[in-house]
Amino acid sequence: MTFKPFLTDQEIASLQIQEAQSDKKQKRTPEQIEAIYTSGTNILVSASAGSGKTFVMIERIMDKILRGVTIDQLFISTFTVKAAGELKERLEKKITEQLRLTNDTALKQFLSEQLLGLQTADIGTMDAFTQKLVTQYGYTLGISPNFRILQDKSEQDLLKNDVFDDLFTDYRTGDQAELFTKLVRNFAGNRKDSSNFRQIIYKIYDFSQATDNPQRWLLENFLKGANTYKDFSAIPEQEVKDFLNTLQETALALRDVTDLEDYKQVTAKGTPTAAYQRHLKMIEQLQDWVLHFDSLYGRDGLGKLANDIATLIPSGNDVTVAGVKYPVFRSLHSRLRGLKHLETIFKYQDQSLPLLQVLQSFTLDFSKQYLQAKMQENAFEFSDIAHFAIQILEENDAIRQLYIDKYHEVMVDEYQDNNHTQERMLELLSNGRNRFMVGDIKQSIYRFRQADPQIFNQKFKDFQEHPEHGKLILLKENFRSQSEVLDATNSVFTHLMDEAVGEILYDDTHQLVAGSSAQKIPYPQNETQVLIYDTKDQQNQDLAVEDDSNQISLGEVKLVAKEIIRLHNEEKVQFEDITLLVSSRTRNDGILQTFDDYGIPLVTDGGEQNYLKSVEVMVMLDTLRSIDNPLNDYALVALLRSPMFAFDEDDLARLALQNLPDQHKQNLYEKMENARNGQGQQVQLITEALSAKLDAFFETFLSWREFSLLNSLYDLIWKIYNDKFYYDYVGSLPKSEQRQANLYALALRADNFEKTGFKGLSRFIRMIDKILENQNDLADVEVALPKNAVTLMTIHKSKGLEFKYVFILNIDKKFSIQDMTSPLILSRQNGVGIKYIADMKEELEEKLLPTVKVSMDTLPYQLNKRELRLATLSEQMRLLYVAMTRSEKKLYLVGKGSQEKLGDQYDGKSENNHLPVADREHYLTFQDWLLAIEAAYAADELHFKTSFITDEDLTEDKMGSLEAEQAYDADNLKDNRQSDDITRALDMLEAVEKLNQHYKAAIHLPTVRTPSQIKKFYEPVMETEGVEVMQTSYQTKPKFELPQFSKKAKQDPTALGSSVHELMQRLHLSEQVSLEDILTALAELSVEENVKKAIQVDKILHFFQTSQLGKLIQANADKVYREAPFAMLQADPASGEDYVVRGIIDGYILFDNRIVLFDYKTDKFTNSQAIKERYRGQMTLYAQALSQSYNIQQVDSYLILLGGEKLEVVEI
């Protein structure tokens, strides 16, 4: 058939005009049309929040299909598995809809093929694709195709730690032992062990894994900064400019302060005040140094200039005028901190280079040995698989060319969250002019996963400045939020985000625009609100705001609860329409408790990390620790005090005194043994009741210890549950469902642990303890949640979602700057920067002390730290953008602080329509940004209102309460019309039942069926033997069987059947299939040896050598298709409804005028006719699917029967 050509630019422009003039209720925007139909070049779609990017992707894919591009010619990368599933589902609906609408037979056939190919199309995460690629071509690198993924962090840590420990020992005793010891001590801090150094190595390793070639980055970039930034001449030009700008801005800020009305410039006698003279001198001197920097100091004199400035200006940040503090010198002091010591730092910085070279060597060796350890386990991390895939494509031009030729277009969603590994993969798959990238740099919030928004940003600038490199399309229209939300968001980011801090300029290019007229209808009551809990009265109370401002206060939660009660009662807002957004999953217990107190239903996003801290799990872990090592007193006491044994304090005190007379340092377990045997020093304290408790404990405990030696962890845990009824016990406690789910999950996690290859109770306990030691936890187990409830989730989890009412909580929480205090900071460009601990004994001429250790920030460290700070602030801005753009109707931002103090904190300054760079760099909370913007700009252009809420506003009488629905009084039927309601309800139930009966077939019809399910539905009874007339009893007779050491395990027919199918798929077809070909394919199977031995190779060879079908397959090897998936619409005769049949065809030969279908069967049989009838329905479906797909009427069907005494080929 002939397909329509792709649209030209002129045709696209014409279509845009037609769309604008149409009477459609929801019109596509000109930019959406451009993004859907443009072809023949690289395209970057910058899609703002709520702009319909998924719609654009779906429409573009469908347009390509309707113009003759097959679904397997498209590579579509999504950020999550869920997103891939949703994309496939929507595409399936679109293709099915097109099938129904068209009457063109050829197009129907083509669309059916696309529907069939959808399930195996390359639509998914990059991880999924690289796994498939490495499975297929990993042999070029010597990688077995049956590798597994190391997804469990605990398993990764066990392997990492083993490799690190061995390598650490080698270096500590090797040729560079002295230098290595100095390196470890440089990062040791206050600790005396290697734990800090271990974390440094893991940090470098993880960072390098996000590059496209970790080893190359470690070799070429790791020491780049250390080798470059050795003296003043190496300081980047931009850093010098920024420093001089800070001097100029400080002088101007000081001038502004001296011009204030309340600033006292002259005395009563009319002479300048001393302060004014001093400040004037500072202003003149700072401006003179800026003006004559090159002649007075130059780049080499930066250190001297910094010291001269430090001498000139006061040590504090503020200038106080009329009681108000103005932070004039804050930015300058921040800049001086590193510069004024640079001369000294440069004297010692060279000493750090040999240490960094050892660090580089150790990290390279660790990376290689860790990979070797994973090779031995045949288990890899996702990053390993991605790098293998890159290596395969870079080293094998033929394989790469296969993919380049295959893909008409390489599409990627959420492009702003790509890392450099993923970007390299996209480059290798593309022909250089067929990439389609969709994303929004303002929503790049995964830097902690090594995502780099600069990949998007650089592409954005490149296409903007060089249109010949690709087309940039901007989707600005937002179809999600009302204008109140959009205006508030724009008013914040217009003054907050630029290239200096934010990485992009938030101008007309990025501002949100309402996409429909309905969104522009004003709702003044929905104006965005900033609600701040006033902490002025909370300083001396138990529930006071903690010094740690990261903790959400009770006052914040109460004001949110009050507003939700008002929304629910007065505006009839459903709880499910309200969402609370927080920065992290931890420390939200106060929210849960307060909402519970006020009866507001609340559900979380299920990502809390408190699993190991739940009481029932802690009890079980201590039980396992005790079984593993009874001499662990802490664990044993916890077990004894648990409900399983219920020893009280008095019992434990008596037992604690039962040491042997000559041994005073015995463990509790040994003392218990002494008491049980009557040998304790204070045996008279052991009462009869306590003795009985001891006997019962030892009987159970020893049985557990014995059981643990010969059985799995899973069985041991369930034995503990059953022996002491602990699982049933927690079922009687509050939140029983959650508690029982936690215990059940513990057993499953233990089982999964052993399935990964790690065995033994000791190793499992060690893994759990390591998780807790690193202050980590496992996610809570999900249980059924109420539907109509307020949702609490993290901002990260909310990305891509939308909610009617949104509360962003804890906006006063400080951004995490922990990475900026680390002794080592990494940069993709500059490599490593460290804090170096130098011995300054000679410099300070110290004679009494053996050493004088001083920690100094090397220049690479200072540059990396500044880069990291700006990147962190930019990411936090994007996080705020994501949070604000989740709301559809109304947005609340909630924080806390003293109204009196906050009022004096912001100076109301702005520059270039933005908050000053220095202020934006200094502020470390969302709240600071919002209040600083409010102080600097007029209220009518901000579109948000700030209110301070006091404790007086949150008294119980003002909080309100939820209006409960009144229940019917069963004893008072007057005027309540209850009988009418019951009658009406019964009538409705009767009507529903009639509908159920009428549409019974449709109700029970599944949307998707497999051929096997349909086969079973129609399958006749083959024989009467073995048919049970009555159901047999489930009670089994007691029996004892001797261990069958010499007997062979019974062969699983399913495993055998799957293996035969895989062998026939892998088998290389030629004009003459040989025994060697079959054995080669057999060797490639990733199955147990006993399964391989069960495959009857002689029958397969006989099939190809003697049967007409086997010879036909060999003669037409180029026309043979194997393991071909299909999907087909079928009408159910009972209900008249359509459903989808999906399956996989073993193989077929495609001729011009006919198709030969064949299927392998390994079923045991004596009568081939019975097998033929059993599979007739299934083969008919296969034939029907092929006939529809290729529009060929003749389909000859054959069964290849391998399960009998001899090979048979039967025609159906």
UniProtKB/Swiss-Prot annotation:
Binding site for ATP: 47-54
UvrD-like helicase C-terminal domain ranges (all copies): 510-800
Cellular component per GO, a single term: DNA helicase complex
Required cofactor names: Mg(2+)
Pfam families linked to this entry: PDDEXK_1, UvrD-helicase, UvrD_C
Reactions catalysed according to its record: Couples ATP hydrolysis with the unwinding of duplex DNA by translocating in the 3'-5' direction; ATP + H2O = ADP + phosphate + H(+)
Top-level taxonomic group: Bacteria
GO BP: any one term: double-strand break repair via homologous recombination
Function: The heterodimer acts as both an ATP-dependent DNA helicase and an ATP-dependent, dual-direction single-stranded exonuclease. Recognizes the chi site generating a DNA molecule suitable for the initiation of homologous recombination. The AddA nuclease domain is required for chi fragment generation; this subunit has the helicase and 3' -> 5' nuclease activities.
Subunit structure: Heterodimer of AddA and AddB/RexB.
PANTHER family on file: ATP-DEPENDENT HELICASE_NUCLEASE SUBUNIT A, UVRD / RECB / PCRA DNA HELICASE FAMILY MEMBER
UniProt xrefs under HAMAP family: AddA
Similarity field: Belongs to the helicase family. AddA subfamily.
Record's protein name: ATP-dependent helicase/nuclease subunit A
Originating organism: Streptococcus mutans serotype c (strain ATCC 700610 / UA159)
Species classification: Bacteria, Bacillati, Bacillota, Bacilli, Lactobacillales
